[in-house]
């Protein structure tokens, strides 16, 4: 009975490791700002707009809205909509919940998704930048 248990344990460990690597590789490399945007989007926006900002019947298609020429492609227009909301369409104002920096980070993430630079899925967390020593 012991070899079977060990074999099953090994199989579970190996399959979990492979699944973890695949899931981690699903999204592409992003900037620190885009990664923070993904984090903020996941907390504040995904409930209605979907985890990957894919089209759905509940909320606006952000990939179309944020694409070049779209109604929210302009950064100022995007910030205004997020800050003030669109009550007539059921979108709440987030200006009192999100900081301007958080809104700008979400803009960077969604812009990358709309421009197809950032694939669906959890983006790969950017590596920490080495600190530069000051000369003096």
What are these regions, as identified by a protein language model?
Residues 1-4:
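Positively charged n-region of N-terminal signal peptides that target proteins for export
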Residues 7-17:
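Bacterial N-terminal signal peptides
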Residues 15-16, 20, 43:
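Short, intrinsically disordered, low-complexity terminal segments
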Residues 20-33, 46-68:
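His/Cys-centered metal/cofactor-coordination and adjacent catalytic loops
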Residues 24-31, 39-43, 92-136:
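Flexible coil segments in periplasmic/lumen-exposed cytochrome c-class electron-transfer proteins
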Residues 30-52, 77-84, 136:
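Sequence/structural segment immediately N-terminal to covalent heme-attachment motifs in c-type
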Residues 56-57, 63-115:
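Extracytoplasmic electron-transfer domains, predominantly the class I c-type cytochrome c fold
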């Amino acid at each position: 009975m012991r070899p079977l248990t060990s074999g099953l344990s090994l199989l579970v460990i190996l399959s979990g490791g492979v699944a973890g690597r695949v899931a981690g590789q699903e999204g592409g490399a992003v900037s620190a700002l885009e990664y923070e945007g993904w984090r903020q989007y996941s907390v504040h926006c995904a409930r209605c707009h979907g985890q990957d900002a894919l089209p759905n019947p509940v909320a606006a298609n952000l990939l179309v809205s944020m694409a070049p020429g779209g109604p929210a492609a302009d950064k100022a227009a995007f910030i205004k909509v997020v800050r003030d909301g669109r009550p007539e369409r059921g979108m709440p104002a987030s200006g009192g919940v999100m900081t301007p920096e958080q809104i700008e980070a979400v803009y960077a993430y969604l812009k990358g998704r709309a421009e197809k630079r950032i694939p669906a899925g959890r983006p790969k967390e950017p590596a920490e930048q080495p600190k530069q020593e000051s000369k003096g």
